[in-house]
Regions:
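Solvent-exposed serine/threonine-rich low-complexity stretches and specific carbohydrate-binding patches
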Residues: 73-90
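Surface-exposed loop/edge segments in extracytoplasmic proteins
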Residues: 6, 67-76
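Conserved Ser/Thr-centered positions that define the repeating blades of beta-propeller domains
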Residues: 62-64
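Noncatalytic modules at the cell exterior or secretory-pathway interfaces
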Residues: 41-47, 101-122
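Short coil-to-beta strand junction motifs in C2/discoidin
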Residues: 54-59
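Solvent-exposed, flexible loop/coil segments flanking beta-strands in beta-rich domains
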Residues: 2-39
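Exposed low-complexity, polar/acidic, P/S/T/G-rich flexible segments that act as propeptides
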Residues: 121-133
Length: 133
């Protein structure tokens, strides 16, 4: 499959969420590409979300150098001179169209989503585009 990462690519088609994380298509697994995911440094996720009966939805992004061991996106928070590192999860608590920018420089990227609460009438589509900033 040939993918131009500079154009939005659907990595999760519209579907109801479950209460466990379900991974979308892993970016970087394609073969025969002229460019690789790690040749870009920005990932933009375009998320169309319908909350239905859910309390919220959660999205996590994981990175891998080898498509085997994945490491969840994290952020740092300073607290009284101590640097604390936390895994990062994006929580969506209302129906909407969301744009999530993510810095990256990894060979493989996996995006997963789940719902919290009752999944009835929920839906999520995720598109990804890569670029250089």
């Amino acid at each position: 499959m040939t993918i131009d990462y500079r154009e939005p690519v659907t990595i999760r088609s519209a579907a109801a969420l479950t209460t466990s994380y379900v991974a979308a298509t892993t970016l970087g697994k394609e073969t025969g590409l002229a460019t690789k995911v790690n040749e870009y440094n920005q990932l933009i996720l375009y998320v169309d979300f319908t909350i239905g009966s859910l309390t919220s939805a959660e999205i996590k992004v994981e990175f891998s150098p080898d498509n085997s061991s994945f490491y969840q996106e994290s952020h740092e928070k300073l607290d009284n001179g101590t640097s604390n590192v936390y895994t990062l999860t994006y929580t969506l608590s209302a129906t909407g169209a969301y744009r999530i920018p993510i810095q990256c420089n990894d060979r493989y990227i996996k995006v997963s989503a789940k719902g919290t609460g009752t999944v009835t009438n929920s839906s999520m589509t995720i598109k990804a585009v890569m670029g250089v900033n």
